Swiss-Prot record:
Pfam families: DHHA1, tRNA-synt_2c, tRNA_SAD. It is found in: Cytoplasm. Zn(2+) binds at H562, H566, C664, H668. It is an enzyme of class 6 (ligase). This is Alanine--tRNA ligase. Binds 1 zinc ion per subunit. GO terms for biological process: alanyl-tRNA aminoacylation; negative regulation of DNA-templated transcription. Belongs to the class-II aminoacyl-tRNA synthetase family. InterPro entries: aa-tRNA-synth_II/BPL/LPL, Ala-tRNA-lgiase_IIc, Ala-tRNA-ligase_IIc_anticod-bd, Ala-tRNA-synth_IIc_core, Ala-tRNA-synth_IIc_N, Ala-tRNA_ligase, Ala_tRNA_ligase_euk/bac, DHHA1_dom. Consists of three domains; the N-terminal catalytic domain, the editing domain and the C-terminal C-Ala domain. The editing domain removes incorrectly charged amino acids, while the C-Ala domain, along with tRNA(Ala), serves as a bridge to cooperatively bring together the editing and aminoacylation centers thus stimulating deacylation of misacylated tRNAs. The gene is alaS. GO terms for molecular function: alanine-tRNA ligase activity; aminoacyl-tRNA deacylase activity; ATP binding; tRNA binding; zinc ion binding. It comes from Neisseria gonorrhoeae (strain ATCC 700825 / FA 1090).
Amino acid sequence: MKTSELRQKFLKFFETKGHTVVRSSSLVPHDDPTLLFTNAGMNQFKDVFLGFDKRPYSRATTAQKCVRAGGKHNDLENVGYTARHHTFFEMMGNFSFGDYFKRDAIHFAWEFLTSPEWLNIPKDKLLATVYAEDDEAYNIWLNEIGMPSERIVRIGDNKGAKYASDNFWQMGDTGPCGPCSEIFYDHGKEIWGGIPGSPEEDGDRWIEIWNCVFMQFNRDEQGNMNPLPKPSVDTGMGLERMAAVMQHVHSNYEIDLFQDLLKAVARETGAPFSMEEPSLKVIADHIRSCSFLIADGVLPSNEGRGYVLRRIIRRAVRHGYKLGQSKPFFHKLVADLVQEMGGAYPELKEKQAQIEEALKNEESRFAQTLETGMALLENALAKGGKTLGGEIIFKLYDTYGFPYDLTADICRERNIEPDEAGFEREMEAQRARARAAQSFKANAQLPYDGQDTEFKGYSERQTESKVLALYKDGEQVVELNEGDSGAVVIDFTPFYAESGGQVGDVGYIFAGENRFEVRDTQKIKAAVFGQFGVQTSGRLKVGDSITAKVDDEIRNANMRNHSATHLMHKALRDVLGGHVEQKGSLVTAESTRFDISHPQAVTAEEIAEVERRVNEAILANVAVNAAIMSMEDAQKTDAMMLFGEKYGDEVRVLQMGGFSTELCGGTHVSRTGDIGLFKIISEGGIAAGVRRIEAITGLNALKWAQEQERLVKDIIAETKAQTEKDVLAKIQAGAAHAKALEKELARAKAELAVHAGAKLLDDAKDLGAAKLVAAQIEADAAALRETVTDLTGKSDNAVILLAAVNEGKVSLCAGVSKALTGKVKAGDLVKFAAEQVGGKGGGRPDLAQAGGTDADKLPEMLASAEGWLCQKLS
């Protein structure tokens, strides 16, 4: 049975048992700051189990994408070296929200596993575990399922505390919890290992394939177990593990899905196919997690989820390097993955080009430092010793982009212990330096347990209200006096709180003659708005009746820019393609800043077309209508939604005629004509595959156009052109004249440099097989190249490394006499040198150039050239 068939069979079985098939949630959890990635099927139902969310169904079944890498659940170092560890896996699950409980959960699992109609697994190959005190589950297995007592194992508190057991699940120190019952499969006596609870339980013979969690209790802060009024069920079946069972293999990497990926890895790396090669398995696993993470909106970066993704990509690239592949290859595996899994997960097909682009960019970036970093690491490991020092690990991390776990992987392969504590000390020292160089704006969470705020701002700019709470220095107070900075909570507010990229409203709160200036509005809690600002006159007390008034001018500007953002979003998708997704936004009174997923720069022609479409919608002056409706009805309108975003049962749909339909809670103009004018003023990249566009509207756009007009007139006057059309010709003529002068100057400098270089060869360091010149001279990049070419032409065994500093920037040029290029390559030398001065470069074996930014490191770099050359010659 193929893995894809097994996935469908599971969902079909539970659908016949009255379960609703729910699509996998994103790998990026929403509204759950405790999770780095979705790592279990129940994650998307957490609020349902806690009673915070309700669904229109009480039974559900899913095939959930999961990632375990980074954070508490981190399988990274084991991946590729064991039969079942993965960074990405699929968890099949069935769930009951106060519907059925233990009896049905166990019977469902048993029927699916053993019925001839479904999987038909021999019953004598299965074993069940239960929590030691869970007699109910034990008796169901014994008396109803008919499992022999010797194959029902009671597992007690085996982790050092009451309820700390492999067979007792808990969400946290308090909250829902309960016993669980696991089903194990026997892979055969030829494989070492014992049953659960035995001294040999860590062996590979008995493998867990199913876990039924019975959410039966609510643990309070005193540790008391109180029965839940509506017990629930959360079960999980690892798809890859079960596929191994159904395909009669022991390792997950032997199943059909992985076999095809492993062959693709061998093809792209040029390595022979072998199930004994861990690097093939590492890469096959990692292409899954990396591709799915990028499809769900994660991009490589230096923090958070993006850094975990970067670590996984670089680990895969390093294993490719280990197999002998030094060119970018990882991104070429995406097509094979799409072939395997694109049917079940259409987002892979839809995002294939973006995934490939993001992976290729990251591969190329790491390739620039991988070889040099590996050389540094090899030199350090070659010195012997049982430990690799933390300072070396940190240098590899900080200078060459080697994540800690990548270096640790290599150390383990050599039986050398990485000094993690030393690395952490170096990291903390770097963090301390960063803290000293920055000042941070505190974002205090204000304590509040009163009534919610009712937002009136969609229809009102001025509201009569009452003060519910006041804050000063983050603490609740009873009054604010003149000059005090603080925050005000009122029961009815016209002030929009920052959300969805739109900044909070500003304005005033009046209590008679007393005035509080609102400079920002933020949500203290989900439905509690805090007005932050200064008491500019008199005093304000809790309980005061007040008038809250929004600043009309700023609100109107915010609305223009927010509505324009919606029109721009739609135009960008129409012009650039449906792959465009919002990655971030900031709407202020001055401008709108919009981040999108797009693999390359937006061209001037594309920007012009987006502007044309948006302004066309503005000129149409269509009505902007907002409606509250169910999510089901909203989906029927084809409203744009943020991929992976979590929405409530009811949503606000904003429609601008036939131009744009989008879910949004922000404030907007009444008609598109109110926007006035739209102009994009900048476009650029902020991360791999992410572009940032800034635009302005209304009078700001007019002001910008007038400034451009003045600038053109100033240029006409400065160039003494007759008309605007003559300006370009004047500028081109001036540039040509300047270029001719620069060439003349460069020629003179080159002659001087060559003359100075002749003496350098006389003073060359004689290393026997080669003569080394490593020096700094006065020259530009062109003169450096000419000097190096001249010197290598005058000697059969010269190795030349020359440096110069111009306007604070370092220029480097390396040359090697042709007779020596078999042993020493100029490209390798200049790359080695450039990385020490904050740069990069390369070239031919006999001549190569590079640049750098750190001129202070030049003496140290030039001095290191001799050691590098001696190593190459030895």
